[in-house]
């Protein structure tokens, strides 16, 4: 696991965007898993800027999002399809037919929808990189604590805390989803590369639990210790409880030199 620590969230977004740019330049038809939430917004702004300045093209890129609320209209401003369109897809040259979310409505069998999403990923050769955030309790996607490390794309009931955290996004007269479709932990682990970004002191404990263990379903993100190509980009606040922060700070420069000399993505 490479842990790269930067001064602030702006530097996190810039460096994460640069990595994604290098990935797409190395493989213009890359299959990239994307995330929603507040953490990647600045990253997406950086990617839009790169596109507008003709430093990158998404014309042949395929994307697969981590999750989507169950039985939500894609035009609902709280759907993750709406989020991705407004934050990224509407502002770049991506073909929206090549953008995928794990959707399921009340008339569809969630098990079959999950299998279909897995088949879509497999048909394109698997994910080259999966972008992740991390919840305060260590969740990735909607894989909350106690989620199976062997899980695949499926429907999940949201925890009371997650429902509470997200309630500010829904109006009083709007029915808030209590379930969501999410990639499973095994689906995430199948990606050739995983890029997790985190900022803020509210993520510091989860970051330390992820990096330093123990490996436990109590912190779903701790499974990334077992990933061959996990890259973690965090700011100083998110690194503030990292037990071995000085070590990771020291080795960052060595990792940077190796990556510059031999490339960031040798396993593509």
Swiss-Prot record:
GO BP annotations, alphabetical order: carbohydrate metabolic process; glucosamine catabolic process; N-acetylglucosamine catabolic process; N-acetylneuraminate catabolic process
InterPro entries registered for this protein in UniProt: Glc/Gal-6P_isomerase, Glucosamine6P_isomerase, Glucosamine6P_isomerase_CS, NagB/RpiA_transferase-like
Catalytic activity as recorded in UniProt: alpha-D-glucosamine 6-phosphate + H2O = beta-D-fructose 6-phosphate + NH4(+)
Annotated metabolic or biological route of this protein: Amino-sugar metabolism; N-acetylneuraminate degradation; D-fructose 6-phosphate from N-acetylneuraminate: step 5/5
Pfam families with a match to the protein in the record: Glucosamine_iso (PF01182)
Catalytic residue list: 67 (proton acceptor), 137 (for ring-opening step), 139 (proton acceptor), 144 (for ring-opening step)
One Gene Ontology cellular component annotation held by this UniProt entry: cytoplasm
EC number: 3.5.99.6
The entry's keywords: Carbohydrate metabolism, Hydrolase
SUPFAM superfamilies given in the database record: NagB/RpiA/CoA transferase-like
Quaternary structure annotation from Swiss-Prot or TrEMBL: Homohexamer.
Cited function: Catalyzes the reversible isomerization-deamination of glucosamine 6-phosphate (GlcN6P) to form fructose 6-phosphate (Fru6P) and ammonium ion.
Name the UniProt record assigns to this protein: Glucosamine-6-phosphate deaminase
Gene: nagB
